Amino acid sequence: MKIKDFSRYTRSIFAIGLLGMTSQAIATATVEVYKSPTCGCCNKWVDHMRENGFTVNTHDIGNKDIRKKSGISETLGSCHTALVNGYAIEGHVPAADIMRLLKEKPKAVGLSVPDMPHGTPGMEGSRVDPYNVLLIKEPDQSRKDTTIYNRYDPYAKQSGKTEPVATEAEKNSSIMRLKP
C-alpha cells in the first residue's frame, strides 16, 4: 500500500469514527420537557423526539417558569420548553434542527419555534404552514433580534418561489397563538 493511499484510508476511517461519535452523543442526549399535563401536541412532539433517538423525560408542571429561567422571552414562547445539553428548546422545533444545534454547538441560549404553527412536529395535520426555527443568541431576546436557523416553507417547494403563496389573511390565521 502506498503512503498516499494509506493516508487517505486513515483519514476516511477517522472521519467515520468522528461521525459515529457525534451520532452517539446526540442519541444519548436526554431532553427534559416542561409542559402542561393536558397538552396533546406536546405529547406528540415528545414522541417525535423519541422516534429520532432522544431520551425524553417529561415534567407536567407547565413551562412558564422554566422558560423564564432559561432566558426565553414571552415573544418566543410556545406550549412547551425543553432543556438538552445546556440549550433551551422552545416549542415545536424539529429533531433535525436540535441535532444540528448539538453538533455545531453555537454560543446560544437555544432554539425556538414561536407559537404553534400547523405542520410542525406535534402539530401535523392536513394544513401545513411556513415557519422559522429561530436561534436565540442572548437571554431575553425578542423575536426581531433572533437569527433564522432554518426555514420550512411548503409553498416555496410547490411553486418554486421563495415567497409563500398564502394571502396575508391566511398567513395571519395560520398560527395558533398563545394567550398572554
Each language-model region and where it sits:
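Bacterial N-terminal signal peptides that target proteins for export
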Residues: 2-14
